[in-house]
Amino acid sequence: MHGLLLAAGLLSLPLHVLAHPQPSTSTSLAGRAGAVDLNEFRIAHRSSYTSHDEMKKLPSIASFRQGTYLEVATELVKQTIPNMEFRLVDDHYVGDSGIGHVRFRQTMHGIDIDNSDFNVNVGKDGKVLSHGNSFYTGPAPSSNPMVKRDFIDPMQALHGVRKALNLPIKADGAHVEDMSEHKVMFKGTSGALSDPTAKLCYMAKEDGSLALTWRVETDIGDNWLLSYMDAKESSKVHNVVDYVAHATFQVYKWGLADPTEGKREILTNPWNLKTSPLTWLSDGQNNFTATRGNNAIAQYNPDGGNDYENNYRPSPKNLKFEYPYSPDMNPPKTYIDASVTELFYTSNVCHDLYYMLGFNEKAGNFQVNNRGQGGKGNDFVILNAQDGSGTNNANFATPPDGQPGRMRAYIWTRANPPRDASFEAGTIIHEYTHGLSNRLCGGPANSRCLNAIESGGMGEGWGDFYATAVRLKPNDTRKTNYVKGGWVNNSPKGVRMYPYSTDMNVNPLVYTSNNKLNEVHAIGTVWCTMLYEVLWNLIDKHGKNDGPVPIFENGVPNDGKYLAMKIVMDGMAIQPCNPNFVQARDAILDADMNLTKGANKCEIWKGFAKRGLGVGAKFDPKNRTGSTQVPNECK
């Protein structure tokens, strides 16, 4: 099933289409009258994380070594939680940092417990580096539900979800087709972009009990939902996950955040053949003359629909994607060729840079043709420019590996003339990073691991962090402040509570600020603020590479900027499903331990501690404890 994660946009958008508007206090179904607040259905935080330092205190386990990394990981699960029923998730891989990432799903009577996962990270030495665990340990159901089948049928579940969430789906006359023992597809519905499905699974509830549910998947465009309907009571929805978080090329060159930072240039063959060996205009089987290739397909989508294959996209003679554009041009459709080209360019550069940093085929990146390098193909990113389904936002939908991602870039009406999100690179990088974080956290096959309020906030924070790191200029120092979304929003304050700054007087956010925040974009601002501190600590130590790509020495970026981007990315793959800030911090420390043998431990600790996530910081969803302490060796 989809592990889609709705990548939130720059701001808080309705529901989970992640986008950029003004911060709001709730997340509701996009565009729905009387919309349901999805925050009420978020999955509760249940994960634990055993860091590398904690593993060293458990020599009998940490030193366990036998066979392949899969065998080591499997044995660890058996030793840690004996007599549990589980299965290996088929998305394990060894990342480019040498860490073997293995994930397991708990089962009961052969039925998945959909939010019970165990991830094991095996180091290059064959020993367990760290692990995360959210396995259910409460009482097991006394009987197999498949024997008596005393649960509602899937059609009742679909109707229940439709009614409970006010979804625009009609199912009168629809019928069910079996896909597997526990999964069905609904044929004959209308109102969804693809046929809805339902899968029978358990959900571990916040009160420690287990609920049998139908996981109903519905893609209605702005929201791509996994709704967990109680299998005994068709009016009770336990949880909801939203997957949407929302030649020559004349473009604003990579590194320019928006049109205020520079002029457009004509670039020849801007792809990197090490990361896009088929170029951006081929999938290995077909060569294209339009904005389509192995990594992405970009088009004009004025009606906001899903028929992207037949939508207009520029297809110039001689592959010269050179079109006029000025922010003063109006209406926006007069420069649609330039808009689609810019969106295609920025997204492809994201693909290439993230590939260099470790987001490759095995890790679940977005490509049609994986060229035998692992992972699942047929999943480029669908890029919709000037998407007509909304305004003042952008969003990204991240299904599991093997299914295309989808980005929608909207027109912003806060200025006159309106502004096109395709031309604010920070917006597009933020959205693309939702695809990165949702595929890495939980593994390529599970896009449901950034759904708790704090992990969802980190999803927003990572988007801002990568967009900000990319836009750093040669003369920037730790005193440089950056706002998010200032150009599209026509506001010097941007779309966040505070600028990103290392000055506590400019940005006072600390870990305990989260105690008063209940919206993912606001929480994400706290997380990115911490990462910005770590970024500058590493730059001050290692310098800053102002080029468009990292330079590696023995697999390690030789500057602070790209090193920060690398270990933050590695941390995403190491951390448990639905992590909290403390666990994600520890995963970054473990990523540095693996990559550099902990050479940057103190710089990382000091960055987090300055913002209250030091030694002694504790997570509690209602009463977080802050700490400015660092380990003794860092004082």
From Swiss-Prot:
A biological process from GO: proteolysis
One MF term in the entry's GO annotations: zinc ion binding
EC numbers on record: 3.4.24.-
Compartment list: Secreted
Keyword ATP-binding: no
Cofactor stoichiometry and binding remark: Binds 1 zinc ion per subunit.
Propeptide: 20-246
UniProt-annotated glycosylation sites, renumbered to this chain: 287, 475, 594, 623
Signal peptide location: 1-19
Bilayer-spanning residue ranges: none
Pfam families recorded: FTP, Peptidase_M36
UniProtKB keywords: Glycoprotein, Hydrolase, Metal-binding, Metalloprotease, Protease, Secreted, Signal, Virulence, Zinc, Zymogen
CDD domains: M36
Catalytic machinery residues: 431
GO CC annotations on file: extracellular region
InterPro entries: FTP_domain (IPR011096), Fungal_virulence_M36 (IPR050371), Peptidase_M36 (IPR001842), Peptidase_M4/M1_CTD_sf (IPR027268)
Cofactor: Zn(2+)
Chain residues that bind Zn(2+): 430, 434
Subcellular location, principal: secreted
Family: Belongs to the peptidase M36 family.
Summary of the function given for this chain in its UniProt record: Secreted metalloproteinase probably acting as a virulence factor.
Matches recorded under PANTHER family: EXTRACELLULAR METALLOPROTEINASE MEP
Protein name: Probable extracellular metalloproteinase 1
